[in-house]
Amino acid sequence: MSHLALQPGFDFQQAGKEVLEIEREGLAELDQYINQHFTLACEKMFNCTGKVVVMGMGKSGHIGRKMAATFASTGTSSFFVHPGEAAHGDLGMVTPQDVVIAISNSGESSEIAALIPVLKRLHVPLICITGRPESSMARAADVHLCVKVPKEACPLGLAPTSSTTATLVMGDALAVALLKARGFTAEDFALSHPGGALGRKLLLRVSDIMHTGDEIPHVNKHATLRDALLEITRKNLGMTVICDESMKIDGIFTDGDLRRVFDMGGDMRQLGIAEVMTPGGIRVRPGILAVDALNLMQSRHITSVLVADGDQLLGVLHMHDLLRAGVV
């Protein structure tokens, strides 16, 4: 490959915009292929009791991997199998309960063609996505989804560009149509993304991160202010609960309450905690989502909340706990 000097006046931005325009035209053509064949493909995938197995070679394989990943994260159980590996044993992963999606822009992939007779013998439903309705794969398919584009964005017409974009979008169309048909929710999405921010917000509950047992700062209502301050210092949560031996809540005392005590003046050594506590305290139940507790704390401008069942203290949640858990 020759490495020539950059042509004088070459416009990178214009070249990029031309690609966008060509690919935009390709996607506009795709609209006509969302038809009865698309409906049939969706129905086969929706009614599949096994998994949706995606196959493709080369660039089609890269698109297929992304397609399978999108299906799997949006409620359609799916995985990718390389056609070459399938021909050497991995086809054993495919069962008659599955649906196979085979991708090839030309529709003449020899690796996939070698698998079709076996898939037919196993009675595995076959959906082929190609850019040529007259291709051998299109003719062999139970359902053919056409992704034909006017031309590739590559000026040589060689590098898959517009065609791979169209295939990717067709996969997204299938995934989202099925998502809507299944009534797939954000909570369902979070179950397959527990490590992400959305997963933490939609799965993590107060009971998962609250302080319990000896970690809870607490004194009884007969304690002095000094006793309460010592407990706050020991437990390092900036507050203490006032409760009886059975952990029935009487109130709460926070660093904000302490500032108000200073404003009162007088001899603080003589004060009982019952005189300066906030009765009751703001409470949440342990089963609520941590993000809901966060919203409550932010709306009430507080840094900690009691976790309780009625008047029975179960735990304490601090803003720092939410920060550590990645909810904030």
UniProtKB/Swiss-Prot annotation:
GO molecular function, one term: arabinose-5-phosphate isomerase activity
EC number of the protein: 5.3.1.13
Pfam families: CBS, SIS
InterPro entries: CBS_dom (IPR000644), CBS_dom_sf (IPR046342), GutQ/KpsF_isomerases (IPR050986), KdsD/KpsF-type (IPR004800), SIS_dom (IPR001347), SIS_dom_sf (IPR046348), SIS_Kpsf (IPR035474)
GO biological processes: lipopolysaccharide biosynthetic process
Superkingdom, natural source: Bacteria
Site positions per UniProt: Catalytically relevant: K59, E111, E152, H193
Coiled coil: none
Keywords, sorted A to Z: Carbohydrate metabolism, CBS domain, Isomerase, Lipopolysaccharide biosynthesis, Metal-binding, Repeat, Zinc
Positions of the SIS domain: 41-184
Residue numbers binding substrate: 75-76, 82, 88, 114-123, 148-150, 275
Record: residues binding Zn(2+): H82
Pathway assigned to this chain's UniProt record: Carbohydrate biosynthesis; 3-deoxy-D-manno-octulosonate biosynthesis; 3-deoxy-D-manno-octulosonate from D-ribulose 5-phosphate: step 1/3; Bacterial outer membrane biogenesis; lipopolysaccharide biosynthesis
Transmembrane segments: none
Substrates-to-products reaction catalysed: D-arabinose 5-phosphate = D-ribulose 5-phosphate
Quaternary structure and partners: Homotetramer.
Family statement drawn from the similarity comment of this UniProt entry: Belongs to the SIS family. GutQ/KpsF subfamily.
Function (record text): Involved in the biosynthesis of 3-deoxy-D-manno-octulosonate (KDO), a unique 8-carbon sugar component of lipopolysaccharides (LPSs). Catalyzes the reversible aldol-ketol isomerization between D-ribulose 5-phosphate (Ru5P) and D-arabinose 5-phosphate (A5P).
Name of the molecule in the record: Arabinose 5-phosphate isomerase KdsD
Gene from which the chain derives: kdsD
